């Protein structure tokens, strides 16, 4: 590693990443996920291997992790169906009986359809005795419109209640307005042309929204405009006021409303960095927050975990892989490391 002028020069990897802008590019194989469809997939062999792993002498946890963390979610669903046909037993229930602790939680999450997993996490967040508004924002603000629609449909089917009804009964004020707007969708799509006049109107509207009676102005701006437009609004707001929009949120809002708006602003500005921050926070706790680690690594491993890894390394000076190695112990370490995939030097 070279040193220039008394300062440590950036590593070759860091320099390349800074020029690539990995968070906004698609890799050569068409995804920024760490987990991709397994090319030599044999559903029969995988189902047989899992059966041997739980019926042999002792549970072969390594085999279970190896199969489930190297197959796409679609392939895992095919394995589950094959296992059911082969044994007349439910794979999730069989593995649940064989495993325990955080490894059990990881395996259960890996085997659930995406929408079912999200619906359960959203329900838990809305019904939590302590505030879990950040989880609700994460799910409602980072899923694609089709993913969110499917999640809400599963929510209604599984819990016999609309998610919007739970939001209405469990929240209030601007937080309720914000979550309802996100759940109902309606964010416009980017046409490729930035409307500078509308951006200026939004900036002025946010500046005028000083008192409690005007707080609702923030909701349509944050939930109906596309991210490209909002980034322009954030920039113009700072130029007009000399204050970052996040500072205005901290000054004007409190409690869950503040948490929700700050989280949403972070998602809008840089979604991979938003997730990197959440992972770092989960790893800094006295006991790692496994619920957060499991949810993010599993939900993003097939979409943009490479981007999240790059943002994590850039901001915190240490790779996500090494951070997981240092903080996570026990059987679940190998599973989370497999989802993370590799070291970033």
From Swiss-Prot:
This is Annexin A9. GO terms for biological process: cell-cell adhesion. Annexin repeats lie at residues 41-112, 113-184, 197-266, 270-341. It comes from the Eukaryota. PROSITE patterns: ANNEXIN_1, ANNEXIN_2. Low affinity receptor for acetylcholine known to be targeted by disease-causing pemphigus vulgaris antibodies in keratinocytes. Belongs to the annexin family. Keywords: Annexin, Receptor, Repeat. GO terms for cellular component: cell surface; cytoplasm; cytosol; nucleus; plasma membrane; synapse; vesicle membrane. The keyword Transmembrane does not apply. Homodimer. One of its GO terms (molecular function) is phosphatidylserine binding. The keyword Repeat applies. InterPro entries: Annexin, Annexin_repeat, Annexin_repeat_CS, Annexin_sf, ANX9. Expressed in the stratified squamous skin epithelium, but not in epithelia of other types (at protein level). It comes from Homo sapiens.
């Amino acid at each position: 590693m070279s040193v220039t002028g008394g300062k440590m020069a950036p590593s070759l990897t860091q320099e390349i990443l800074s020029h690539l802008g990995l968070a906004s590019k698609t890799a050569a194989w068409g995804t920024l996920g760490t987990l991709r469809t397994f090319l030599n997939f044999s559903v029969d062999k995988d189902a047989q291997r899992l059966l041997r792993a739980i019926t042999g002498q002792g549970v072969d946890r390594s085999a279970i992790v190896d199969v489930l963390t190297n197959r796409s979610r679609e392939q895992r669903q095919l394995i589950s169906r094959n296992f059911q046909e082969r044994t007349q037993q439910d794979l999730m229930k069989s593995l649940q009986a064989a495993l325990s602790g955080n490894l059990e939680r990881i395996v259960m999450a890996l085997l659930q359809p995406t929408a079912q997993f999200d619906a359960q996490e959203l329900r838990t967040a809305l019904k939590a005795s302590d505030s879990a508004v950040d989880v609700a924002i994460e799910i409602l603000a980072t899923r694609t419109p089709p993913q969110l629609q499917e999640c809400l449909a599963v929510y209604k089917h599984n819990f016999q209640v609309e998610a919007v009804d739970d939001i209405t009964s469990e929240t209030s004020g601007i937080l309720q307005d914000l979550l309802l707007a996100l759940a109902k969708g309606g964010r416009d799509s980017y046409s490729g042309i930035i409307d500078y006049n509308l951006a200026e109107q939004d900036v002025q509207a946010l500046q005028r929204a000083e008192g409690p009676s005007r707080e609702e102005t923030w909701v349509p701006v944050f939930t109906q405009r596309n991210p490209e437009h909002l980034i322009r609004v954030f920039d113009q707001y700072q130029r007009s006021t000399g204050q970052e929009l996040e500072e205005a949120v901290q000054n004007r809002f409190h409690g869950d409303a503040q948490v929700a708006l700050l989280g949403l602003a972070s998602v809008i500005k840089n979604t991979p960095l938003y997730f990197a921050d959440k992972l770092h926070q989960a790893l800094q706790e006295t006991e790692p927050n496994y619920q957060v680690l499991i949810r993010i690594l599993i939900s993003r491993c097939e979409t943009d975990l490479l981007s999240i890894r790059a943002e994590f390394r850039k901001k915190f000076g240490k790779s996500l892989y090494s951070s997981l190695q240092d903080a996570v112990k026990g059987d679940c370490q190998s599973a989370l490391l497999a989802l993370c995939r590799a070291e970033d030097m």
